Regions:
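His-Asp phosphorelay/catalytic-motif detector in bacterial-type signaling
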Residues: 69-71, 96-104
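Conserved phosphotransfer microenvironments
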Residues: 71, 75-93
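Two-component signal transduction core modules
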Residues: 73, 126-127
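Alpha4 helix (beta4-alpha4-beta5 surface) of REC/receiver domains from two-component response regulators
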Residues: 86, 107-125
Length: 146
């Protein structure tokens, strides 16, 4: 580089001068489970697209939704003393009362027969455990697109 501040043709600017493209903020996804392996499976499947926030009990879901405003909530059917079904119904009641914005809810079920419970809890979609990452990604994408 000469004294006039120009670069020879075809040379790259120093790293300190290279503009960094702005990164789009990642949307937040809330996972409610007390099982570490379930959290790890969900975070591995969806974490590349979303910032993953975890709560360990159904009673913590509403406060976490209020604080983080996730676009997607993943509820394990079996969590603590307030299970995924109760947490899902609680969110839907709060949404209908206009106290929180609407979120898409995916429930993680223990068996196919639990689909009845997920439907009654007004979940947008559900996946039966063990979690297949491809199925969970597709289910989450479809729930968010609905």
């Amino acid at each position: 580089m000469g004294g006039n501040g120009h670069r020879p043709p075809g040379t790259l600017p120093p790293m300190s001068e290279t503009p960094t493209p702005p990164t789009a903020p990642r949307s937040t996804m809330l996972v409610a489970t007390d099982a570490d392996h379930v959290h790890d499976e969900v975070a591995a499947a969806l974490g590349g697209d979303h910032e993953v926030v975890r709560v360990h009990a159904g009673a913590e879901v509403l406060a976490a939704v209020t604080a983080h405003q996730p676009v997607l909530v993943v509820l394990d059917l079996q969590i603590g003393n307030m299970g995924g079904m109760a947490a899902c119904l609680d969110l839907r009641l709060e949404q209908r009362a206009n106290r929180i914005p609407a979120q898409r809810i995916v429930m993680l079920l223990d068996r196919d027969a639990d689909a009845f419970l997920a439907h009654r809890a007004e979940a947008d979609a559900w996946v039966v455990k063990p979690v297949d990452p491809l199925v969970l990604r597709r289910t989450a994408r479809e729930a968010l697109a609905a």
